[in-house]
Amino acid sequence: MKEEKNITPMLAQYHKIKDQYPDALVLYRLGDFYEMFYEDAHTGARELNIVLTKKKVGKDRYIPMCGIPFHSADSYITRLVSKGYKVAICEQLEDASKAKGIVKRDVIRVLTPGTYFENEKLKSALLGIYQERGRFYIAYLDLSTGEFTGGSLNRDELISFIGKFQPKEIVVQEGYDFSDLRSQFKSIFFSQLPEDYFSEDTHSEFLGFFKTGHISAFGFDTEEQNVIYPLSAVWKYAKVTQKSFLPFISTPKPYREDSYVRLDYSAQKHLEIVSPNEGNIPLLRVMDRTLTGMGRRKLRFFLLHPLKNSKEIIKRQNAVTELVENTELREKIRDILDQIFDIERLISKISSNTSTPRDLVGLRESLKKVSKLKEISKEIKSDLLKESFERIEDYSWLIEKLDRYLEDDPPIHLKEGGLIKKGVDKDLDELKEIKEKGNEWLKSYQEKLRKETGIQSLKIGFNKVMGYYIEVTKPNLKLVPDHFRRRQTLSNAERFITDELQSFEEKILSADEKIKALEYEIFMRIREEVAFLSDRIGKTAQQVGMIDAIQSLAQIAVEKGWTKPDIHDGYEIEIKEGYHPVIKEFMPDFVPNNLKMNRNSYFHIITGPNMAGKSTFIRQSAIIILLAQTGSYIPAKKGKIGVVDAIFTRIGSGDALAKGLSTFMVEMLEMANIVNNATERSFIVLDEVGRGTSTYDGLSIGWAISEYLAEKVKVKTLFATHYHELTQLEREIKGVKNFHMDIFEDGENIKFLYRVKEGFSNKSYGVHVAKLAGIKEQIIKRAYEILYYFEEQRDKKLEEDIYSLKQKENSYLNEINELPLFKEIEDIEKDEYRQILEEIESIDIGSITPVEALVFLNDLKKKIKRLKES
């Protein structure tokens, strides 16, 4: 900040502090307000919609200023942090009345989007990224729960991870170009950290904090060792920003994508698992029957991390089944869970010194309910639930202590008193007795004064500004004795003090201050003891979350009448009368559909008009498979699910269009990801491919991709398309089957039946849909005329082109084979031919995609044609 001349000591102090936090809004404590100055004031006033005023700092000199009340600062801070600002809290470090000169102040904490954890409605989580040799080493830290994890990811896995965990802030090493991530995740706040955050000294501090000597102690493999860079950087960032308020952080755990079904960012968005598209509702909201914060987070994790080990799926499924079938047990568990607070968040607040007395009481009451959960563990039969119940620790000793120490209904603020019960501390009890006897003395003294003065309405009161006083109404003022000293005049009364009352006030207020100080001291000791148990209590909270998530899956299954799918390691998938669980909520008459995929029928081409239900059917199929592999029951009459290793989707392109990518480029990038990563065990959903280019280009690419996926990969695929020509693939490739959306026709009118039927649709019904939408009759009539003409031409020419495609391919190859290029290599003298040969030799057959192969072959053909002509 620019130096100013002739400024007050207070402003000089402010400048010194602001210079240390140039990228933060500094909230500078002045009495009962936090003040902002200069540019911070302009920003604060604008973002908080509060008055921008000015402060006089010299003769005819003013600076911009705005302020927020100390007692309601949290709501203002939340608004600033949620908008992506860093906020530095600068507190008074001494009593202003006792300070010599300027009051000591310093920043006690820096709040950022990724580290502000007190507000339960504002999700905060921090992601650190360290890049080396094409790998992304990551560390994820949620200070609100203490969750800490790290891993080694490729770029696609990184994007998927960000989509799943949705951090509010990403920290990277200085100089790292994160512009591509910023453009994709506009709501995330990015921070660059200096090199020392990634240094060996920081590594040593980090390992020392967790009392270990090497990263392998956390379970990281040799090839994951670089994860220490983001882990230690994120830990230091939290430590530097939170200072003495650093909450409990659990021991880092390895995060490995290969433990779960691959669910990339596109699939997360297209299936709307936790984040809906505009105007829609996510799957999570429909599925959620959890009763605790821990359970809600665990259920979210389940949906974003489906299992791919059949034994693990069945183990979780059996736990769900036990609660589905045992209504009494399920309701007993739900009744207990409904009374448990978010223990993980409470532990974070308690360990960070930001908790209130009520937080500790909330923890006490929650642990009582957890003990009740423990009591019913003998009724549990399924392995997974039994493990969770058995891992719940016995905290009866801690509950007893908190019961004995803490009042049942303490105040919100620490220093108001009323925190500690009688019998805890002898000195405290004596002081409380003085105060209680004081109350008796006041009643007695008030009665005495009434008798002496004859003023029956005389009363003794107290307020924080004036202290104790004797109040007499104006009609009785003539009866006031001389030894009453006037303290205050009101509109209808006068207030007085006497020597006796003043002496009592000094004595009782002294006792009250001592009570508050001693209670605060005792409370802080208790809080420290509980904070020491954070790790153990946190592990119990995780088990409560697991139990809650499982009962939630059971509850939704019972409510909706879902069925238990048969999970197996085979290839087949069969779903009978399945439906979309979200759409069904708003369409009770939703039409269910069947899906059967096996070695003879695994690539389904689905045709039919828009609005007929193609997109809904392919999405619901993916969602049902996903739910089955979370261990959930499914929205279907029956299900037989061969475990998949990945769910891929190619639907829509809105987000990427905003980044300046064409529709076609978006499609090709997504298809490249699918083609490069899909295996025979995957499941693919394609909703149109090749829309963003010419009809023939789009059809050719759709055809080539379908051939590759069906012939080479043999991956289970649902391909919804308007390219009716693709239905001819059923004749060419075993496993390709045609399906269409059933339509009822009545003359020129149609009715969508929303049923998937075998065979292909030879009509698009696009004009019918336009008619339903209300397009003018004359346009509809003209559209039919044009449609009939195009269909006639297509029948003559397009089918001929498609059938001759393979012959043309062979013709191209024959042309190439006849060239000197493919005769004796030693006879080739032309540099152009040699260059072409080198290009061919350089191709990696194992990694080239079908689309890349087509482009390469086309370029090669053009080059050879030019050479022949020359």
UniProtKB/Swiss-Prot annotation:
InterPro entries: DNA_mismatch_repair_MutS (IPR005748), DNA_mismatch_repair_MutS-lik_N (IPR007695), DNA_mismatch_repair_MutS/MSH (IPR017261), DNA_mismatch_repair_MutS_C (IPR000432), DNA_mismatch_repair_MutS_clamp (IPR007861), DNA_mismatch_repair_MutS_core (IPR007696), DNA_mismatch_repair_MutS_N (IPR016151), DNA_mismatch_repair_MutS_sf (IPR036187). Keywords: ATP-binding, DNA damage, DNA repair, DNA-binding, Nucleotide-binding. It comes from the Bacteria. Gene3D superfamilies: 1.10.1420.10, DNA repair protein MutS, domain I, MutS, connector domain, P-loop containing nucleotide triphosphate hydrolases. One of its GO terms (cellular component) is cytosol. ATP binds at G608, P609, N610, M611, A612, G613, K614, S615. The keyword DNA repair applies. SMART domains: MUTSac, MUTSd. Signal peptide: none annotated. GO terms for molecular function: ATP binding; ATP-dependent DNA damage sensor activity; damaged DNA binding; mismatched DNA binding. Coiled coil: none annotated. GO terms for biological process: mismatch repair. CDD domains: ABC_MutS1 (cd03284). Belongs to the DNA mismatch repair MutS family. This protein is involved in the repair of mismatches in DNA. It is possible that it carries out the mismatch recognition step. This protein has a weak ATPase activity. This is DNA mismatch repair protein MutS. It comes from Persephonella marina (strain DSM 14350 / EX-H1).
